[in-house]
A protein has these predicted regions:
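Bacterial Sec-dependent N-terminal signal peptides
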Residues: 1-25
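Extracellular/lumen-exposed scaffold segments
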Residues: 22-160
Length: 160
């Protein structure tokens, strides 16, 4: 039986979905958050977002070398009590994989991102929760899964 060229892409997408179901992609990365025990309002504070990438997998860096690849991006839900000053992404590993013709910028193992933020000075409560999301595309040496995201929260105790 010959596969028509029109049907081949659909067959490949369906077949890849069976081998690597979408639910696999959100199990490739765990997100851990490290923050100081207490933060002061109106002062720049740094938090660490640690992406723990499962062995045998990698994710594209924040600035992939190929514009067609999905970058790893951290974002935060709008919160009027906090101001994100800067997100510092780690240096990627530059390597060439079996399926790639050119070099790629990747994170593998553990990637540590720094978030510089400031709680607004007129914030009066003793605690604050900041919700964020990391978007990434997990890949191994044979294939890439669909881009996915994982939510995380930063819980802050505010010094009065």
């Amino acid at each position: 039986m010959k596969l028509n060229k029109f049907y081949l892409p659909f067959f490949l997408i369906f077949f890849t979905g069976i081998i690597f179901p979408q639910s696999t992609s959100d199990k490739v990365v765990d997100v851990k958050v490290k923050v100081p025990k207490v933060v002061s309002s109106n002062k720049i504070t740094e938090a660490e977002i640690i992406l723990q990438i499962k062995n045998g997998w990698h994710i594209n860096a924040n600035k992939p070398l190929d514009e067609n690849l999905s970058p790893t991006v951290i974002s935060f839900k709008n919160n009027p009590n906090i101001q994100i000053k800067k997100i510092i992404y780690p240096e990627p590993v530059i390597t060439k994989l079996q399926f790639s013709q050119s070099q790629m910028a990747l994170y593998e193992g553990e990637a540590s991102l720094k978030i510089q933020f400031m709680v607004k000075k007129d914030f009066k409560a003793k605690a604050l929760k900041v919700d964020g999301e990391v978007q990434y595309q997990p890949c191994n040496n044979q294939t890439c899964l669909f881009p996915t995201s994982k939510n995380f929260s930063i819980s802050l105790k505010i010094k009065k």
